[in-house]
Amino acid sequence: MNVEDIIEKVANGEIKLHQVEKYVNGDKRLATEIRRKALERKLGISLKHIGHYSIDPNELIGRNIENMIGVVQIPMGVAGPLKINGEYAKGEFYIPLATTEGALVASVNRGCSALTEAGGVVTTILDDKMTRAPLIRCPNARRAREVAEWVKENLNYLQEKAVAKVTRHGKLRDVKPFIVGNNLYLRFEFETGDAMGMNMVTIASEEIMKVIEEEFPDVRYLALSGNLCVDKKPNAVNFILGRGKTVVAEAIVPREIVEKKLKTTPELIAEVNYFKNLVGSAQAGSYGFNAHFGNIVGAIFLATGQDEAQITEGSHGITIAEVTPEGDLYISITMPSLEIGTVGGGTRVPTQREALSIMGVAGGGDPPGVNAKKFAEIVAGAVLAGELSLLAAIAAKHLARAHKMLGR
């Protein structure tokens, strides 16, 4: 069967999209082209831009994508340099931002300029863990409590018996049990090195469930995720307990810089932040007590191959702005749930790996975990730059003007 015959059979449904590879001896690049051409024929459209790319489907299909037909290209800009005085990120960094929102890169760039001129951003990682919360059905609440207590007392045993069997980098460090009636939710916390770690902790949690069922034959493991993890959904537990990296970025911006570069005052920025980000968000019932964490997190995630659905939790957090006794501006952002990695998943895609290399965080660190922490500090610094610039634009009544100029 020649290529033209395969395209026709895919277009009319005789060959399913996921079956194409076996008709072309596993040539994934050719299979990608066939699927795209079959779709063009069936729908009567042109997909020439989707079909124009440099990355190799043979490296992606089966690892990052199924039924591949091409790529979506998102414009990528760079903001910076941003000076960061972190525990892992030390120096000046450029921030890759993939977005179609005009004015976003310019705004973050302005924030980077102001913060760097002010001496830079201080970043602090408060916590680092990835969680998974399996659901166990128990005969009653007392049995659920007994199981929870046993698990808390046997973390080292579970690490050796279960976790170490399936991962070299994952380490079970804690568990927080939640009991609802006769249902037990075990929110396991793991260290995952430079990986974001969801696959790692999912596989490890399943091994732990096998051990628990052996130890307690009268309980039943029902779901590997009981939704108390919590992954890819707005939620309070991550906001309070954290998931991924919990990180703070802060800076003091002298009044002169606020007035000359940002065209406003520390007092106005503090007032806008309080009544917009704190009071307004409280009235809305939002977990985003901030101006636009999600804008910067989303643009960096798309550029660097992070799990884009976890932009949800990355948008959670609090911005604080206040006038110091000296009359300058103190500004900080706190991100409780920044779920990122520098190895695995989409970070293997060549374009995304190149974006990570712009910040000097591509691949694993030595020791494991330091690259992901460095990356977290850079992201937090960029988010602070974005918050500072947008709050200043709102305070100066420049927001609409900027979008008229750059956002059409």
From Swiss-Prot:
Record-annotated membrane-spanning stretches: none
Catalytic residues, chain numbering: 101, 307, 403
Enzyme class name: oxidoreductase
SUPFAM superfamilies in the cross-refs: NAD-binding domain of HMG-CoA reductase, Substrate-binding domain of HMG-CoA reductase
Functional description taken from the UniProt entry: Converts HMG-CoA to mevalonate.
PANTHER family to which the protein is assigned, alphabetical: 3-HYDROXY-3-METHYLGLUTARYL-COENZYME A REDUCTASE
Name of the protein described by the UniProt record: 3-hydroxy-3-methylglutaryl-coenzyme A reductase
Organism name: Pyrococcus abyssi (strain GE5 / Orsay)
